[in-house]
Amino acid sequence: MMESYDVIVIGAGPGGYNAAIRAGQLGLKVACVEGRETLGGTCLNVGCMPSKALLHASELYAAASGGEFARLGIRVSPELDLAQMMKQKDESVAALTRGVEFLFRKHKVQWIKGWARLQGEGRVGVALADGGHAQLEARDIVIATGSEPAPLPGVPVDNQRILDSTGALELVEVPRHLVVIGAGVIGLELGSVWRRLGAQVTVLEYLERICPGLDGETARTLQRALTRQGMRFRLGTRVVAARSGEQGVELDLQPAAGGATESLQADYVLVAIGRRPYTEGLGLETVGLASDRRGMLENQGQRSAAPGVWVIGDVTSGPMLAHKAEEEAIVCIERIAGHAAEMNAEVIPSVIYTQPEVASVGLGEEQLQAARREYKVGRFPFSANSRAKINHESEGFIKILSDARSDQVLGVHMIGPGVSEMIGEACVAMEFSASAEDLALTCHPHPTRSEALRQAAMDVHGRAMQN
């Protein structure tokens, strides 16, 4: 029997579950097809949320064991209980996934547990998790299948010794030596977790810099900070092969520019070279769609070339970020419901949850220079911010880039304490086409780290008062 819906959402990650919830809110009959045992996709289950749980716990452990507590007059002798750390992480994740289930019930979203495949216009077949099969039809179908870790030729992931990001969240022991392949967001965050817990961490990167999408000055500052924390970086390095055994892994390395091969030993290796869209096996050909060479699906305003098929999140162009997927989900469903909806792709913030944190939105200096666009720069260091100084967290800065003529804010780049919670103000400013002067004239509470943003805006015009 064919079950009919207004909307079928394939995938229940941040894009998929938010699309399903918004459809329910708008009174549409909606089904969400997800084969995992829990909702939330990579982000909630094996990505954003568990990694943040370990980042937070490891930061506290490092503060207690590394002298930061003692400096404040708090004397403790911490002992690492890795099993409990992993348990609390899993409990937090379970609570979040149950929360999504509650929201599905609240908004009358039907969760069909299984794996979906398109079967022609308006039709979806589902291989149910319990072994059965279901046939669904809908006027509109939303593909929100997300992404998976990208493989590295010659380095086979087994999640025993050679790990992907999921495996790195489930280790039962602290590595003696963890080698991270890839100096991007995932590699640096997970590498910093295990460094704080006692591992020697070596980061290998093919390029001559870390975080290639990040503003150059910010990236260099982050690398210096992580180096001081004990992480080792080998840039311009190519991994050509890996051999794993019971006791560890042997890697063959070469200079990216060419040269002799050398070996590097580790007891664990994390492959974190990026992610690729999960679009294989979806039956795209049955509706006349094909992914590009990167596996991504083209769209105009989330609408694909196939009638009634929409695409959101990591399967589309742009940064693979949960909040970008959520934004696209809202726009997509509003349009399906016949409402006007737009998304500003120029104002999608990104955050690296290392210590110090990194946050940015908009254009960087390299991008502005490549476009030959004239701009002004305002900087303010956290070493001159009273709250950061009092908290002994004075590393980093905030940088604002504004148009040389109009003063419109073009980009904001932050590295320092708590900047993940501050970048939202910059996003609001840019959404309203604010000028640097607008930020400079806005009263900020004292003493807070957010004052550094105002001072950076003042510095665009050479008027910073506290530096």
Swiss-Prot record:
InterPro entries: Class-I_Pyr_Nuc-Dis_Oxidored, FAD/NAD-bd_sf, FAD/NAD-binding_dom, FAD/NAD-linked_Rdtase_dimer_sf, Lipoamide_DH, Pyr_nuc-diS_OxRdtase, Pyr_nucl-diS_OxRdtase_dimer, Pyr_OxRdtase_I_AS
Principal cellular location given in the protein's record: cytoplasm
GO annotations of cellular component type: cytoplasm
Binding site for FAD: 34-43, 52, 116, 314, 322
UniProt GO MF annotations: dihydrolipoyl dehydrogenase (NADH) activity; flavin adenine dinucleotide binding
Binding site for NAD(+): 182-186, 205, 239, 272-275
One biological process term in Gene Ontology: pyruvate metabolic process
Record's subcellular location: Cytoplasm
Other known facts: The active site is a redox-active disulfide bond.
Oligomer and partners: Homodimer.
Role: LPD-3 may substitute for lipoamide dehydrogenase of the 2-oxoglutarate dehydrogenase and pyruvate multienzyme complexes when the latter is inactive or missing.
Family assignment from sequence similarity: Belongs to the class-I pyridine nucleotide-disulfide oxidoreductase family.
Protein name: Dihydrolipoyl dehydrogenase 3
Organism: Pseudomonas aeruginosa (strain ATCC 15692 / DSM 22644 / CIP 104116 / JCM 14847 / LMG 12228 / 1C / PRS 101 / PAO1)
